């Protein structure tokens, strides 16, 4: 077993060696290095063939038509293109959008920008389990609502929203539905042939593919129109100009092909690892699981260790790569906005750690990690006067602290 141990698979995943091999073949002079837009010679034709093959592989994982897959630089760009693209194209129909308070910053910062442009956005508060229900969305719908954007799997707490039920509602009301699927590919079955989803964002690097490449599913039936954000050579049917990065695209295609083949077996194995980890830490006092216990992916275990500061616990777990909050926002010392939206108090939100397991996690690593967590939590609590007061039966929430 090699240290440190990587338990932050929701932040990014290592590229699968099979994916890396396919990518290398598209880089050098001996390989498939041409520009897919070069129509006048064989180098371009071969590159275009590789790009279209990858498009089919991505479409196959999510049961879409390959013509509905638009290449982007990642899920952040896909979210921007979907939300701004719809808002700007359909602004004459209405200027109201609906999303939730627990979305990724790539959605929330995009809607904030639209608010500055004069759009109105309703931010739905989730239940204590972190889930967004169709009834919550129904209550927020207005005559001028043009788009609902709700994530499939939450990046911090791993909860799975019922996008099938939400899609039925939005379609019946004639409102477009965008789903951020960055965290769900390879973890949850996605059948866009039957789901009433109009737009869906994907990322390669959360599914053992390379960083810097993603895709946006844009429904053809019913047809969805978008205003482009990148202008240039008219690539991707005018929706996203820019020379296609063949090696990145081929990597994403191969990653999604592997995900389709291995997802069922991999999920069973990862659930066993997650259960194994939880069984070894669940006897710690004042331990809370954040998010629904049932509607969640097995890869994610977000735990709050009351009376332990999350950042100090991460420091104590120097052999484990884990995070507090999402990788995109954990640089700030604010408690997780996702956990706050669930109704967790600041103390519990600050004491949360996200453990995420993946393809290369082993039982040996899990056992070592669980042992280290138990030792660190016990040691840090022994140093905490708040823990002593709690053990003495003092209700800490009733204490009035003196101002300095």
Swiss-Prot record:
Keyword Transport listed? The answer is: no
- Using the UniProt record, give the first listed, main subcellular location: cytoplasm
Q: Provide the E.C. number(s) assigned to this enzyme.
A: 2.8.1.7
Q: Which GO terms describe its molecular function?
A: 2 iron, 2 sulfur cluster binding; cysteine desulfurase activity; metal ion binding; pyridoxal phosphate binding
Membrane spanning stretches: none
Question: What Pfam families does UniProt report for this protein, alphabetically?
Answer: Aminotran_5
User: Which GO cellular component does the record give, naming just one?
Assistant: L-cysteine desulfurase complex
Modified sites of kind N6-(pyridoxal phosphate)lysine = 206
Q: Where does [2Fe-2S] cluster bind?
A: 328
Question: Catalysed reaction per UniProt?
Answer: (sulfur carrier)-H + L-cysteine = (sulfur carrier)-SH + L-alanine
**Subcellular location(s) per record:** Cytoplasm
Q: Which UniProt keywords apply?
A: 2Fe-2S, Cytoplasm, Iron, Iron-sulfur, Metal-binding, Pyridoxal phosphate, Transferase
Q: Subunit structure, per the record?
A: Homodimer. Forms a heterotetramer with IscU, interacts with other sulfur acceptors.
Q: What does this protein do?
A: Master enzyme that delivers sulfur to a number of partners involved in Fe-S cluster assembly, tRNA modification or cofactor biosynthesis. Catalyzes the removal of elemental sulfur atoms from cysteine to produce alanine. Functions as a sulfur delivery protein for Fe-S cluster synthesis onto IscU, an Fe-S scaffold assembly protein, as well as other S acceptor proteins.
The entry's protein name is Cysteine desulfurase IscS
Organism encoding this protein:
Pseudomonas syringae pv. tomato (strain ATCC BAA-871 / DC3000)
